[in-house]
From Swiss-Prot:
Free-text function comment from the UniProt entry: Plays a critical role in the sodium-dependent reabsorption of bile acids from the lumen of the small intestine. Transports various bile acids, unconjugated or conjugated, such as cholate and taurocholate. Also responsible for bile acid transport in the renal proximal tubules, a salvage mechanism that helps conserve bile acids. Works collaboratively with the Na(+)-taurocholate cotransporting polypeptide (NTCP), the organic solute transporter (OST), and the bile salt export pump (BSEP), to ensure efficacious biological recycling of bile acids during enterohepatic circulation.
Annotated tissue distribution: Mainly expressed in ileum and kidney, lower expression in cecum.
Catalytic activity, as annotated: taurocholate(out) + 2 Na(+)(out) = taurocholate(in) + 2 Na(+)(in); cholate(out) + 2 Na(+)(out) = cholate(in) + 2 Na(+)(in); taurochenodeoxycholate(out) + 2 Na(+)(out) = taurochenodeoxycholate(in) + 2 Na(+)(in); tauroursodeoxycholate(out) + 2 Na(+)(out) = tauroursodeoxycholate(in) + 2 Na(+)(in)
Name of the gene: SLC10A2
Subcellular location: Membrane
Descriptive protein name: Ileal sodium/bile acid cotransporter
GO cellular component terms listed in the entry, alphabetical order: apical plasma membrane; microvillus; plasma membrane
GO molecular function per UniProt: bile acid:sodium symporter activity
Residues in the Cytoplasmic compartment per record: 50-82, 148-157, 217-224, 306-348
Disease: Bile acid malabsorption, primary, 1: An autosomal recessive intestinal disorder associated with chronic watery diarrhea, excess fecal bile acids, steatorrhea and interruption of the enterohepatic circulation of bile acids.
Region of interest: Disordered: 320-348
Feature: compositional bias, Basic and acidic residues: 320-329
Residue numbers of Phosphoserine PTMs: 335
Family to which the UniProt record says this protein belongs: Belongs to the bile acid:sodium symporter (BASS) (TC 2.A.28) family.
Record organism: Homo sapiens
Length: 348
C-alpha cells in the first residue's frame, strides 16, 4: 500500500511530505507547434482572401478613404469607449478593467476578412481596414490606453509589443498582396483558390477556438462579471459598427464589413500585451479574458452569419435593390449585397 505522506515518483525535491513536481511542458510544446501550424494556415487563407481583392478597387479605398475613416472611428473610438463604459458599469477590479480596455484598443483581427467574405461584404474595404487599423495601432493603442486606463493604472506599466504588431502587419499584407496579384493575372484560377480558401478559413476559425479551449482550460474559471462583459462587448462592437456605418451612408454590404471589422478584435495581440505587462499572480485574474472574448466574438459572428444566409435565401433575390452610385472608380453596384460566392451555389 502506498504511503499517503510519501512523495510522488517524479518529484525532484522532497522534504518530508513536501514535494516539488516538475511542471509539465506539454502545453508549451503544443502551443508552439499549433501556433506555427495555425500561422502558416492563416497565411494561406489570407492569400486566398486576397484572390477576391481587386487592385483598382483596393486603391480606390485608399484614395477616397471614407469607408476606412468610418472603420477607424469605430475601431479606435467606439470600441475603447465601450470597454470603458462596461468596466465602470460592472465595477470590476482595476486589473480586469485594464484587460477589457486592452481588448477594446486592439486593431481588427484577420478573422474579420474571412467573415466579411462569407456575408458578401466588401473584401477590398475589409482588407484595407484591417491593414490600416493594424498600422495605426502603433500610435493609437498607446494613446487610447493612456486616455482610458489612467484612473486604474499607470499607463507606462502596459507594454505594447510593437514587434508583434509589425509581424501581424507583414503576415497580413504579404499573402494578401500575392493573392491580389494572382487575381489580377489569373482571375479564373483565383476563383478556384478563393473557394478552397474560404472553406479552409471557416474551418480555421473553428480550429482556433477549439485549440484555445484545449490550451487554456482554466478560462472557464473566471469572474462572472467578466463572462457577462465578454458576452456583451463583441455584440456591442458588431451592432454599433453597423449602426455608425449606416448613419455614415455606406451601402448595406459595407455596413456588414465595418460591423465585423469593429467587433472582431485581434485577441492574440491582446494576450501578448497582457503577458508582457502583468506579474504571474495578476495573470491568474485576467489572462483568460481575451479567450472569453474570442469565443463569444466567433459565436455571435456565426449567429449573425446564419441570420444573413437565411435572410438572403428568403428575401435577397426578391429585394428591390437600389444601385449604388459610381464610387472609387468602380461601376454602379447593388447597395444590398455584393456576392462573393459564399454559401452560393455555382450557376448551372
Amino acid at each position: 500500500m502506498n504511503d499517503p505522506n510519501s512523495c510522488v515518483d517524479n518529484a525532484t525535491v522532497c522534504s518530508g511530505a513536501s514535494c516539488v513536481v516538475p511542471e509539465s511542458n506539454f502545453n508549451n510544446i503544443l502551443s508552439v507547434v499549433l501556433s506555427t501550424v495555425l500561422t502558416i494556415l492563416l497565411a494561406l487563407v489570407m492569400f486566398s482572401m486576397g484572390c477576391n481583392v481587386e487592385i483598382k478597387k483596393f486603391l480606390g479605398h485608399i484614395k477616397r478613404p471614407w469607408g476606412i475613416c468610418v472603420g477607424f472611428l469605430c475601431q479606435f473610438g467606439i470600441m475603447p469607449l465601450t470597454g470603458f463604459i462596461l468596466s465602470v458599469a460592472f465595477d470590476i477590479l482595476p486589473l480586469q478593467a485594464v484587460v477589457v480596455l486592452i481588448i477594446g484598443c486592439c486593431p481588427g483581427g484577420t478573422a474579420s476578412n474571412i467573415l466579411a467574405y462569407w456575408v458578401d461584404g466588401d473584401m477590398d474595404l475589409s482588407v484595407s481596414m484591417t491593414t490600416c487599423s493594424t498600422l495605426l495601432a502603433l500610435g493609437m493603442m498607446p494613446l487610447c490606453l493612456l486616455i482610458y486606463t489612467k484612473m486604474w493604472v499607470d499607463s507606462g506599466s502596459i507594454v505594447i509589443p510593437y514587434d508583434n504588431i509589425g509581424t501581424s502587419l507583414v503576415s497580413l499584407v504579404v499573402p494578401v498582396s500575392i493573392g491580389m496579384f494572382v487575381n489580377h493575372k489569373w482571375p479564373q484560377k483565383a476563383k478556384i483558390i478563393l473557394k478552397i480558401g474560404s472553406i479552409a478559413g471557416a474551418i480555421l476559425i473553428v480550429l482556433i477556438a477549439v485549440v484555445g479551449g484545449i490550451l487554456y482550460q482554466s478560462a472557464w474559471i473566471i469572474a462572472p462579471k467578466l463572462w457577462i462583459i465578454g458576452t456583451i462587448f463583441p455584440v456591442a462592437g458588431y451592432s454599433l459598427g453597423f449602426l455608425l456605418a449606416r448613419i455614415a451612408g455606406l451601402p448595406w454590404y459595407r455596413c456588414r464589413t465595418v460591423a465585423f471589422e469593429t467587433g472582431m478584435q485581434n485577441t492574440q495581440l491582446c494576450s501578448t500585451i497582457v503577458q508582457l505587462s502583468f506579474t504571474p499572480e495578476e495573470l491568474n485574474v485576467v489572462f483568460t479574458f481575451p479567450l472569453i472574448y474570442s469565443i463569444f466574438q466567433l459565436a455571435f459572428a456565426a449567429i449573425f452569419l446564419g441570420f444573413y444566409v437565411a435572410y438572403k435565401k428568403c428575401h435577397g433575390k426578391n429585394k428591390a435593390e437600389i444601385p449604388e452610385s459610381k464610387e472609387n472608380g468602380t461601376e454602379p453596384e447593388s447597395s444590398f449585397y455584393k456576392a462573393n460566392g459564399g454559401f452560393q451555389p455555382d450557376e448551372k
